[in-house]
Amino acid sequence: SLYKIRVAELENILEPEIVDLKLLRSFCSNGIPDCNGFRALCWKLLLGYLSPNKSTWTETLRKKRELYNQFIEEMIIPPGENADGKCIDHPLSEGPESSWSTFFKDNEVLLQIDKDVRRLCPDISFFQQATDYPCNVVSESRERKLHIRVAPSTLSSANVERKGLGVTKINLITKRATENYEAMDEGQEAHWEVVERILFIYAKLNPGQGYVQGMNEIVGPIYYVMASNPCVEYREYAEADCFFCFTALMSEIRDFFIKTLDESEGGIKMMMNKLTMLLKEKDYDIWMRLKEQELYPQYYSFRWITLLLSQEFPLPDVLRIWDTVFSDEKRFTFLIKVCCAMILLLREQILDNDFASNVKLLQNFPPMDINHVLSKAFSIN
C-alpha cells in the first residue's frame, strides 16, 4: 500500500549516519507516517533538538535530560527544602538570599498556567489521563505539585478590573466541571500536570517574556507526540524532550507573543499583513469584500497565526499541518499559505455573508477535510 511505501521511504532517509535534512524536509512536508515514533523523531530533527549526525544523539539526549532534571530540582522543589526534603529556609525569612519572595511571585504566573492547562485539547481525553512516568521527586510529595501551590490563592485568579480610583471589581470565574481537569493522587500525575511543569520552568528560564496565554496550546501537541511515542525509552523522557522542542519552537515564534516586537519582521502584524497581501493577490473579490466590511485580519488571523492553527482544527489535523510547517525552511511562509487557503475555501459564504456572519465564520472555522485545505495551500505559489 501507499502507506507502507512511505514508511519504507522514511526508514531509508533516516538510515544513514548523517541524515540528509533537505530530503527529510521534503518528505515530511507531505505528512509523517503515524507509527513507530516517526513523528517524534522527525520533529526533534526539524526543530533542531537533534543534529543530523546520528552519532551525537545518545549524548545530546543524555545531557539535555540531565539538564532538565536540574531545572526541576532548582525550580520546582519548594524553597526551604532540598531534594531530600530537609528544611533549609523559612517562609518568613526576609534575608536577601531567601527564595520565598520569588516563590510567591511565581505563584501569580502559576495561576494563569494552571487555569490554561486544565482545559488543554478538550476534544481528547489524553491530558486527563495518568502518565506512566510521573516525575518522582515531585509526585511523591504533595507540596511539590504545582497545582497544590495554586489552590490557596484561587481568589486571585479572578478577573480583577480597576475602575477609576482604585475601586476593584472582581468577576469570579466559577469552575465548571466540564472545563477543569482533576488532579491525580500522590504518586501519580496526569499529563496536564506535566505540561504545567514544562510551562512553569519555561517561564522561569525566560523572565523577559515569561508565560503568555496561548503557549499552552503550542506545547500541548508537542507533548502529545512525545508522550504517545510507542517506543518506551522515548516515552519515559517525553517531558524533557518536549521541553527542549517547545523551547526551540518558541525561539522562532516568540515574536508573535511579544507586544513590543509587533512591528518586527517576524512580528504578528507583519504576518497578518503578509496574509492580507497574499489574499489580495489570489482572490481580489474576497479581499475587497472583507475590506468593505472592515473585517480586519486581527479579528480572526491573530489567533490562527499566533497559535499555529492549533485552535482551528482537531488535534490529528493540527499534527498534520505542523509536519509541513516544521519542514518549511522559511518556517512560516507555508503557515500563511494555509491561512490563505482556509479563506479561499470559504469564498461563496464570505461573498454572501454580512459582517457579523463573516466574523462568526472566520472565528469558528467550519470542519473541513484537512487534505483539501493543504492541497489548496500547496497550490498557492
Question: How would you label these PLM feature ranges?
Answer:
Residues 30-32, 326-329:
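Solenoid-like repeat scaffolds
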Residues 35, 212, 313-317:
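Helix N-cap / loop-to-helix initiation motif
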